[in-house]
């Protein structure tokens, strides 16, 4: 039986003879050999680890500095103990590594390196420091359809390239679209290929559901088979949200989402007054991408030739005020709950990690900003009081704000904000009884 490292090396063509990878300090290599560490573990000495950027069910993502190049990178650290006996998740890890190494595009996060210890796998990728897509939009003084076109063109270009390689991302959403740096003209990159799939051929289909509710295509949920068109649907949802600040779908369950998609002639509605100053071309663009039958959706290449993309008649009026109404509350709620969930996941991982043999400390907690939680609590109190005044029902405006959240984030932050604040700050375990379709890797089912 080959070792896990041998399986990865042969499967993903990692060149273990690369001098930069293995010609490390001879003392470090000798110590690693004595301690039973894999040969590639010597590469860890080339990195200084920084803050934790995120955490899932099987590990964390941390910022790091590569000493040999002085380059900042992101390192996904996965616990082998958490993956042990889970062949599906191991296969997903191998597929993510394989896909990342095959892709090379300016709008796709780039693969840098991988290595392993006795207890963990390390995947090193480009670090995008410019912030998430919607966060940057909120910081602007002006946002027009022209700006939206520039964003969607970059996303479409990346998806067109992926699809040419028969790769389906399956989790396109604003949180996975990042700016490379903080410069005004920074390019965007698509990140998180954790549930991406390599198709065997042009017409190959996947039959197991995975994705994020609110952005996932209907055919993924019905498990009738999905392929490249599911990414096009997600682009349609991103475009809609980009131009008005709220999600087109407010359902908090799979059943509710499917009902929303099929209740009317079109799966989405362009509400007044939010869409009054938006061009007819972009509405047509969105409706094309959101066709219920995946076979009827245009390809990424065809969308790049759409009149909204190529026309010089795109609206230039400032739509930022309306967009901010939807983005602002969404950001406050999501930021607070993600910090709470991050620390809780890290605690669970640390408990598992403490049983390992590695001497390094790769998993650390982040601090929760108390003022952030205060602001969210007040926003929720206002929302709750206004709802009570209207007989327990949210207004249309409040429903739009709520629709900007995923089911899990909204449910969990309401719970957190209504509990004793100090318990929340202490990282009390959250109730995971209700989950979205895509909660990191726990609910990702694969072939």
Swiss-Prot record:
EC number(s) recorded for this UniProt protein: 2.7.11.17
Residue(s) carrying Phosphotyrosine: 353
Phosphothreonine found at: 316
GO cellular component assignments: cytoplasm
Domain of life: Eukaryota
Keywords: ATP-binding, Calmodulin-binding, Kinase, Nucleotide-binding, Phosphoprotein, Serine/threonine-protein kinase, Transferase
Gene3D superfamilies named among the record's database cross-references: Transferase(Phosphotransferase) domain 1
Residues the record marks as active site: 171 (proton acceptor)
Location of Phosphoserine modifications: 354, 367, 371, 387, 443
Compositional bias segments (type: Basic and acidic residues): 432-447
Family of the protein in this entry: Belongs to the protein kinase superfamily. CAMK Ser/Thr protein kinase family. CaMK subfamily.
Protein residues bound to ATP: 53-61, 76
Organism this protein belongs to: Saccharomyces cerevisiae (strain ATCC 204508 / S288c) (Baker's yeast)
Name the UniProt record assigns to this protein: Calcium/calmodulin-dependent protein kinase II
């Amino acid at each position: 039986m080959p070792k896990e490292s041998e399986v990865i090396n042969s499967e993903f063509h990692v060149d273990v003879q690369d001098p930069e990878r293995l010609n490390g300090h001879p003392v470090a290599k000798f110590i690693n050999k004595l301690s039973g560490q894999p040969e590639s573990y010597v590469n860890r000495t080339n990195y200084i680890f920084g803050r934790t950027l995120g955490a899932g069910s099987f590990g964390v993502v941390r910022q790091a500095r590569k000493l040999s190049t002085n380059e900042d990178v992101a390192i996904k650290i996965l616990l082998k103990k958490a993956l042990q006996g889970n062949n599906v998740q191991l296969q997903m890890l191998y597929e993510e590594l394989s896909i990342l190494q095959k892709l090379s595009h300016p709008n796709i996060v780039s693969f840098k390196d991988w290595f392993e210890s006795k207890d963990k796998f390390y995947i090193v990728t480009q670090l995008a420091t410019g912030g998430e897509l919607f966060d940057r939009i909120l910081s602007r003084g002006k946002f027009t359809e022209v700006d939206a076109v520039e964003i969607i063109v970059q996303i479409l270009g990346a998806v067109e390239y992926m699809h040419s390689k028969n790769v389906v991302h399956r989790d396109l959403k604003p949180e996975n679209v990042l700016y490379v740096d903080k410069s005004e003209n920074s390019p965007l990159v698509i990140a998180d290929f954790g549930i991406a799939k390599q198709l065997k051929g042009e017409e190959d289909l996947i039959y197991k559901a995975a994705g994020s509710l609110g952005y996932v295509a209907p055919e993924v949920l019905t498990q009738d088979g999905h392929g490249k068109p599911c990414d096009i649907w997600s682009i349609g949802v991103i475009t809609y949200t980009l131009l008005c600040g709220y999600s087109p779908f407010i359902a908090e369950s799979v059943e509710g989402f499917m009902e929303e998609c099929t209740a009317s002639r079109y799966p989405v509605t362009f509400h007044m007054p939010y869409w009054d100053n938006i061009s007819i071309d972009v509405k047509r663009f969105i409706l094309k991408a959101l066709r219920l039958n995946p076979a009827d959706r245009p390809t990424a290449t065809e969308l790049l030739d759409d009149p909204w993309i190529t026309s010089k008649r795109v609206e230039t009026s400032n739509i930022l005020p309306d967009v901010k109404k939807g983005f602002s509350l969404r950001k406050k709620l999501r930021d607070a709950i993600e910090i709470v969930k991050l620390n809780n996941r890290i605690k669970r991982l640390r408990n598992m990690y403490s049983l390992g043999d590695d001497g390094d400390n790769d998993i650390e907690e982040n601090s929760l900003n108390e003022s952030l939680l205060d602001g969210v609590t007040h926003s929720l109190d206002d929302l709750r009081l206004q709802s009570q005044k209207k007989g327990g029902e949210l207004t249309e405006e409040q429903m739009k704000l709520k629709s900007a959240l995923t089911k899990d984030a909204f449910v969990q932050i309401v719970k957190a904000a209504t509990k004793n604040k100090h318990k929340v700050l202490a990282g009390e375990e959250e109730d995971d009884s209700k989950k979205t379709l895509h909660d990191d890797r726990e609910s990702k089912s694969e072939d």
